[in-house]
Amino acid sequence: MSEDGQKIISANKYIEVANSGAFTSTNPKGKIVVAGSSSVTPVMEKLIEAYKAINTNADIELQESDSTTGITSTSDGTCDIGMASRELKDTETALGLKATVIAMDGIAVIVNNNNPAEDYTVDQVKDIFTGSAAKWEEVK
């Protein structure tokens, strides 16, 4: 991602990941469709805005949905760029899809004050959300 893009990432409270220099105008032609994750959408809106400021004839359509839709739409050609807030699965990379990380975000797990849940590890939270542990007493 460009230096200018990383400034946008940082300004929107995401963690920068890479820097490849400044934006430059490429005089693009045609339309690009970007689709996927609602958690990526706010920063993508800013990136598109900055890109269009330099490439005034750029035609970019942004479609907000979810990570899986973004990945599937990229795979089937419905969109040009998919947005995902998760890593690609092996089955998705086997289709030839390639992930380019533009930022990192944080996820918080919040429980009610009356819930005795405390100090769970990432693996324990994963067990809860994947269904491996369906009851609190099953969390090990």
Regions found by a protein language model. Name each.
Residues 1-140:
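Flexible loop/hinge segments at secondary-structure junctions
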